[in-house]
């Protein structure tokens, strides 16, 4: 594989704090630069790049969708032209979708007194929506987001960009306690599958508690996160290093450090994309319309080397 593209993929794979949309945009930039350096890309090059993106962040739908576009291009008679068109569409959606989601979010908050919002982890789309609606938000409460501390990043950005918003940080274990005082639990998603959405581990418990006490759960994600069943079947939820939990753990101690979990769609959960509010049934129809390359499943395995 092209070494500059390889370095870009490796940097994306190592990133533990950026949201899926941010990483996908970086991936699009790297792929478009690669395509310009190699105006005629071979089928093998496309499939090698597809494999690299499949394994870089295997729980994040936009990167899996980009891998799918690379695999689809490999079977085209004019792969370079197909790839340029698909990357242009993908990049445009990633650039413009956050503003559309932010507009819908602002309208949903209404014009009554400013609200308290609970959020979890870090999502660039959620952050942009909150900042755009700062005149209608009194306070945002978020937890640390251990072990990678993405919640701190969220709070730092709100303090820097969300003038007038009260920023409050708490522990992961205590975040649910403040849901009763909030207008809504607002989270992002790394993937939107047919039966549920994938986000940071711990999201499911927050959603269950919010639903139990009657608080709305809003999932903000653009349509690059839509994940067809055939791609979801090869997706994997990565576990982190033991050292992120305990740097010098005792021998014989097993450490479980899941990064992601799937939360099923349920009453109280509303999905907001750039197209507006979506029901699970609407999501399923849109997901089923996405073309999936038959080559994708085989690419999960490392390429054969002779």
Q: Could you tell me what each predicted segment is?
A:
Residues 1-87:
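Long amphipathic alpha-helical segments
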Residues 20-21, 117-126, 147-148:
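Gly/Ser/Thr-rich loops at beta-strand to alpha-helix junctions
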Residues 34-41, 74-78, 135-136, 268-272, ...:
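Short helix-capping/linker segments at secondary-structure and domain boundaries
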Residues 48-75, 86-98, 120, 233-252, ...:
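Non-catalytic, soluble scaffold/interaction modules
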Residues 71-115, 131, 135-185:
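Ligand-binding beta-strand-loop-alpha-helix segment within the catalytic cores
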Residues 118-120, 143, 220:
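Short hydrophobic segments within beta-strands
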Residues 123-134, 207:
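Histidine-anchored nucleotide/phosphate-binding helix
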Residues 137, 145-306:
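Conserved phosphate- and dinucleotide-binding cores of soluble alpha/beta proteins
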């Amino acid at each position: 594989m092209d070494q500059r593209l390889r370095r870009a993929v490796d940097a994306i794979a190592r990133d533990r704090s950026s949201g899926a949309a941010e990483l996908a945009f970086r991936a699009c930039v790297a792929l478009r630069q690669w395509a310009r350096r190699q105006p005629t890309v071979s089928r093998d090059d496309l499939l090698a790049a597809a494999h690299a993106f499949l394994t870089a962040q295997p729980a994040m739908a936009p990167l899996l969708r980009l891998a799918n576009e690379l695999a689809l291009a490999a079977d085209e008679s004019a792969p370079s032209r197909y790839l340029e068109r698909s990357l242009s569409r993908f990049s445009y959606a990633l650039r413009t979708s956050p503003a559309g989601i932010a507009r819908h979010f602002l309208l949903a908050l209404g014009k009554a007194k400013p609200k308290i919002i609970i959020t979890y982890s870090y999502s660039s789309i959620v952050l942009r929506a909150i900042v755009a609606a700062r005149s209608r938000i009194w306070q945002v409460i978020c937890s640390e987001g251990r072990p990678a501390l993405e919640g701190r990043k969220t709070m730092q950005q709100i303090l820097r960009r969300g003038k007038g918003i009260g920023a409050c940080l708490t522990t992961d274990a205590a975040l649910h306690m403040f849901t009763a005082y909030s207008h809504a639990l607002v989270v992002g998603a790394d993937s939107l599958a047919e039966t549920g959405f994938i986000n940071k581990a711990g999201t499911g418990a927050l959603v269950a508690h919010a639903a139990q006490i009657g608080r709305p759960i809003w999932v903000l994600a653009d349509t690059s996160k839509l994940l067809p069943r055939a791609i979801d079947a090869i997706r994997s939820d990565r576990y982190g290093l033991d050292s992120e939990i305990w740097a010098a753990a005792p021998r014989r101690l097993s450490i479980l450090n899941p990064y992601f979990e799937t939360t099923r769609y349920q009453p109280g959960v509303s999905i907001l994309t750039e197209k507006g509010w979506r029901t699970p049934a609407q999501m399923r129809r849109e997901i089923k319309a996405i073309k999936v390359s038959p080559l994708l499943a085989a690419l999960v395995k490392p390429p054969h080397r002779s």
